From Swiss-Prot:
Modification N6-acetyllysine occurs at: 167
This protein's name: Ferroptosis suppressor protein 1
Modifications after synthesis and translation: N-myristoylation at Gly-2 mediates the recruitment to lipid droplets and plasma membrane. Acetylation at Lys-167 prevents AIFM2 ubiquitination and degradation, thereby inhibiting ferroptosis. KAT2B mediates acetylation at Lys-167, while HDAC3 removes it.
Membrane topology, from the record: Lipid-anchor
Organism: Taeniopygia guttata
Amino acid sequence: MGSRLSLDGSVRVVVVGGGFGGTAAASLLKSWAVPFVLVDVRDAFHHNVAALRAAVESGFAKKTFISYSVTFGDSFRQGKVVAIDPGRQQVVLSDGEELHYSHLILATGSDGPFPGKFNQVIDMESAIQTYEDMVKEIEKSQRILVVGGGAAGVEMAAEIKTEYPGKEIILIHSKTALADVELLPSVRQVVKEILLRKGVRLLLSEKVSDIENLRPNQFQKDMVVRTEKGTEVVVDMVVLCTGIKINSSAYAAAFGDKMASDGALKVNKHLQLEGYENIYAIGDCADLKEPKMAYHAGLHANVVVTNIINSLTQKPLKTYEPGSLTFLLSMGRNDGVGQVNGYYVGRLLVTIAKSRDLFVSKSWRTMGQTMPS
């Protein structure tokens, strides 16, 4: 990909959200010289696939935030989308600026608890410092409870135990099997074996009873945490890895009738929003029968940018079919397990492919910048 198209002045793609899908789409549009504006509420892309390690390993966080303006220049707007007017083909920002679009890509992503997701609207340097502060809290804590045993929870427990083998790590999960339900049973079993081998204590089929009263991510010696079954654990710190929520606020008013129950947008096989030929949804905010993953957002971006270009050049549109699942779990920098196109892959391949650098170098390449050492 990447040549110049002869376009008239009416073409302008607005991309709402600068996560994995939005930055991939913007980078592709840039390479094709298609006029675009990327809008995000923050000043930097967050490579949150590596966020858990940034919370554990000092000096790593600076590799996980990448400036938008350095990459996209005048094609980037920092701002919050407060309204979308599909009739006038406009996106309205909180400062009153109105961005006209010929095509709209909604890539608003999802939120979840820190450190897996970063929810504050602060500048890049302050964001990096927030992770460095978390590293210090973990260093002080001898006993750490990780709440939630999906992909984020098992990776978090493994990251801490790899960096600090002497700490007591307890993982609590409301179900009997760990990681995501879409994964092969063999993968989920190996996840459990890796954690046990590392010395993580597992409390399965248990739920924390007073989760809203906990103060997560802070050292607090000898906290007593109770489960609904009456189990008590005494810990110095709690880390929440308890699931995600779709960021729908930018589009809920305009497209409420096109939303699934979780807030994701209903799309057709071309990833077009139902009822619109020039509006697309990608990544976590697209209602697709597949796990919410950075890898999928990148695939969506490819399809959508191709479809925008094909629609401008009178070519047929590409379809997106969720395929057999590819899902790699990094269990610390020296271990991992997963599956590729539905087939099991073991420790060596996953460690080489993901666990060592968690794809951070790939994001710096996508953004055309040099990663800090």
